[in-house]
């Protein structure tokens, strides 16, 4: 079955909307990347220095190529930041976010040494789950899609064919029995709930059926006249206000692992066959305990599947449900993309090794479970893709990195370089200093920087050294904080914001290579024990660390070392080469490097400013609360989801601000501001961003009301 035959894809052009035009090295890089891709080169590398605008270059490249794009990123937080950047640059296109939906995940495991079985335990983030469904929905219904994803995209997912087969197509004026539609919704794993109406449920009131698809925040109302669909409306689930009328709509299943009755029946039969074979094998080896354990667990799962259509851990039976042969690769997000999609690997020197490492780590745990009777052997086929399977599923690939790895450089025919920064900022000067008296020298340099209201990053090799250095600097009267692995993700971002604000002046850490540490206020990066060869002091790591000072006009890097290693020499030579290129460009074009004023690449910095603005604003309005409870709950009134393909912007607000009294509107602003902070605390950066935007619109409306009074 062709996906195109089943669904009418919306075709709209990618269009970058930005007040800026490509500058510096960007025009040359965009043109050369596009030429290489259009010429059919399979692998292309963009070596882009820190601060040269690689994300914007990617957006302009996608606009030129007009192809669905998957952008792979190394972790969730960076994926959220990059998705926000793309949404700003491509507001009329579908920019999706696909990462693991677990806030907490403890996979099931068995420790033979202590005879300890650890049950699977997890906490699912509902908003991230919605965004995952939104990504697959967008890929199947339109062409102008960019999905920003972590390596979660190579883990097993239901087949797109079955996902589409279970889909319901609604058309105004079409003949459809209401009860048949309700049964279809149940088969798609939606739950009827006439009281608590939320995402993944539907309710029925006479000839009116309402459902909130898993990938939407708004509800869909289907009104029948006999067996004819009289109208299809998108509406706000709380207020009931109609947002728009629909002529046609697709409702996709509530789970990526949904299967029809026929497919589930076949799966149950093949699971029973495998169980019999495995029990015979275990009993022939006198593993009676393992055989009994496997019989009990699998029989229970089979009963659940027969009665309910699913069971806990149903993904472990995905090979049977998909009808795949033993040892075959699982379906994953890559299978939802059209054949001509473009893959962009961000920070490829980190992301590529991640992809290759996923399979073995997962397999060693599952192998133990199978050997001791906790799972059937087919559970090992619920896994991430192997490296060669990943390569089979991708087409043309663009690798982005300031320090591309050996693999990328080996695959590509040379590389495209992007060194020149539009701002004119030059790579920092690198100074090598002796280790003798390094702490006293560092303390003196810190005092020089703090006197100028500048910030300092210090990177050490060990946790103990970082802790001791932090204590020493505190005793010396330096305002310092220590960034370590025990600090959770949101607190890390808060530390960066506090560093920028001047709450403290020095940040000490071990691995300060993360992209979130691009801080314009940092004028000095100190690298202790720079001559200790290893992962943290390799050429790649040193260049990445040097880049942390590349956002400041007077940036410097001090390497404390007893001798200059090969890694140090290569890193220094590359930095000097890039400095020379930028300086020559500045002189030729008469550019005077300007200090960079850049927000932290995350939503929390905006939230802090928004919070202060909202507090002042409401205070100015008299701080009167009406007591009106909008009852928005966790989801809020956010309607700024993916912009429609028509390019007309976001959906109309679900609540018309003009219809509310000023006091109620002020109360709504305060409630939504609280939800904005809660969303950020839950790492739901996309939801927080949408709430932030809506708060801004509501404040404009309230200011207008105030002027008219």
UniProtKB/Swiss-Prot annotation:
Which compartment or compartments is the protein found in?
Cytoplasm
Q: Which UniProt keywords apply?
A: ATP-binding, Cytoplasm, DNA damage, DNA excision, DNA repair, Excision nuclease, Nucleotide-binding, SOS response
Which sites bind ATP? 48-55
Q: Which GO terms describe its molecular function?
A: ATP binding; ATP hydrolysis activity; DNA binding; excinuclease ABC activity
Q: Per the database record, which ranges form the Helicase ATP-binding domain?
A: 35-416
Residue ranges of every copy of the UVR domain listed in the record: 666-701
For the biological process aspect of GO, one term held by this record is: nucleotide-excision repair
Query: Where in the numbering of this chain does the Helicase C-terminal domain appear?
Result: 438-604
- Chief place where the protein resides: cytoplasm
User: Where does the motif Beta-hairpin lie?
Assistant: 101-124
Q: Which NCBIfam families match?
A: PRK05298.1, uvrb
Q: What is this protein called?
A: UvrABC system protein B
Which source organism does the UniProt entry give?
Micrococcus luteus (strain ATCC 4698 / DSM 20030 / JCM 1464 / CCM 169 / CCUG 5858 / IAM 1056 / NBRC 3333 / NCIMB 9278 / NCTC 2665 / VKM Ac-2230)
């Amino acid at each position: 079955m062709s996906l195109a035959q089943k669904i009418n894809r919306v075709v709209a052009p990618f269009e970058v909307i930005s007040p800026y035009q490509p500058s510096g090295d960007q025009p040359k890089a965009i043109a050369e990347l596009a030429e290489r891709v259009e010429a059919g080169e399979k692998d292309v590398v963009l070596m882009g220095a820190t601060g040269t605008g690689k994300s914007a270059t990617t957006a302009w490249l996608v606009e030129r190529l007009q192809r669905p794009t998957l952008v792979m990123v190394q972790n969730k937080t960076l994926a959220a930041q990059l998705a926000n950047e793309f949404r700003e640059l491509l507001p009329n296109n579908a920019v999706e976010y696909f990462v693991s939906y677990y806030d907490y995940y403890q996979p099931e495991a068995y420790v033979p040494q202590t005879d300890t079985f650890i049950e699977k335990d997890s906490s699912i983030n509902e908003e991230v789950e919605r965004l995952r469904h939104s990504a697959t929905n967008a890929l199947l219904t339109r062409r102008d899609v960019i999905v920003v994803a972590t390596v979660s995209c190579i883990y097993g997912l239901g087949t797109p064919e079955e996902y589409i087969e279970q889909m319901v197509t609604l058309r105004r004026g079409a003949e459809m029995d209401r009860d048949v539609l309700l049964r279809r919704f149940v088969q798609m794993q939606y739950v009827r709930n006439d009281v608590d109406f939320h995402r993944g449920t539907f309710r029925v009131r006479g000839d009116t059926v309402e459902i909130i698809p898993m990938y939407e925040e708004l509800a869909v109302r289907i009104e029948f006249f006999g067996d004819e669909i009289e109208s299809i409306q998108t509406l706000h689930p709380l207020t009931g206000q109609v947002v728009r009328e629909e002529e046609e709509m697709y409702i996709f299943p509530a789970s990526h692992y949904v299967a029809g009755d026929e497919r589930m029946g076949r799966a149950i039969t093949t699971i029973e066959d495998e169980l019999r074979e495995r029990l015979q094998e275990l009993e022939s080896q006198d593993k009676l305990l393992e055989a009994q354990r496997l019989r009990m667990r699998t029989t229970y799962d089979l009963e659940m599947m027969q009665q309910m259509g699913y069971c806990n851990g149903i993904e472990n039976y995905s090979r049977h449900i998909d009808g795949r042969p033993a040892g075959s690769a699982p379906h994953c997000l890559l299978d939802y993309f059209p054949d001509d999609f473009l893959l962009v690997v961000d920070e490829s020197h980190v992301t590529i090794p991640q992809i290759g490492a996923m399979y073995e780590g997962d397999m060693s745990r599952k192998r133990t479970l199978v050997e001791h009777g906790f799972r059937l052997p087919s559970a090992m086929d619920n896994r991430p893709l192997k490296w060669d399977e990943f390569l089979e599923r991708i087409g043309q690939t663009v690798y982005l990195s300031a320090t591309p790895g050996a693999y990328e450089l080996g695959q590509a025919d040379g590389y495209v370089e992007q060194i020149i920064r539009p701002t004119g900022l030059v790579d920092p000067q690198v100074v090598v200093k002796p280790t003798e008296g390094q702490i006293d020298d560092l303390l003196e340099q810190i005092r020089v920087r703090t006197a100028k209201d500048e910030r300092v990053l210090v990177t050490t090799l060990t946790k103990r050294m970082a802790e001791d250095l932090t204590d020493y600097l505190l005793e010396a009267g330096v305002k310092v904080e220590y960034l370590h692995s025990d600090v959770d993700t949101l607190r890390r971002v808060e530390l960066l914001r506090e560093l920028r604000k001047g709450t403290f002046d020095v940040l000490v850490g071990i691995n300060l290579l993360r992209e979130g540490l691009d801080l314009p206020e940092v004028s000095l990066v100190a690298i202790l024990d720079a001559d200790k060869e290893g992962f943290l002091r390799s050429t790649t790591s040193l260049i990445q660390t040097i880049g942390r000072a590349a956002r400041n006009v007077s940036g410097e890097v001090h390497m404390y070392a007893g001798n200059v290693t090969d890694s140090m020499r290569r890193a220094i030579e590359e930095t000097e080469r890039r400095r020379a290129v930028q300086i020559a460009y500045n002189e030729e074009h008469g550019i005077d490097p300007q200090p960079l004023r850049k927000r932290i690449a995350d939503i929390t910095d905006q939230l802090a400013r928004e919070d202060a603005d909202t507090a002042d604003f409401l205070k100015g309005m008299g701080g009167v609360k009406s007591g009106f409870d909008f009852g928005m709950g966790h989801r809020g009134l956010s309607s700024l989801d993916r912009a429609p393909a028509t390019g007309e912007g976001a959906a109309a607000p679900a609540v018309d601000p003009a219809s509310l009294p000023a006091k109620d509107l002020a109360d709504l602003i305060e409630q939504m501001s609280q939800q904005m902070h809660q969303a950020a605390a839950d790492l739901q950066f996309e939801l927080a961003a949408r709430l932030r935007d809506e708060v801004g619109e509501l404040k404009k409306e309230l200011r207008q009301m105030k002027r008219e009074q």
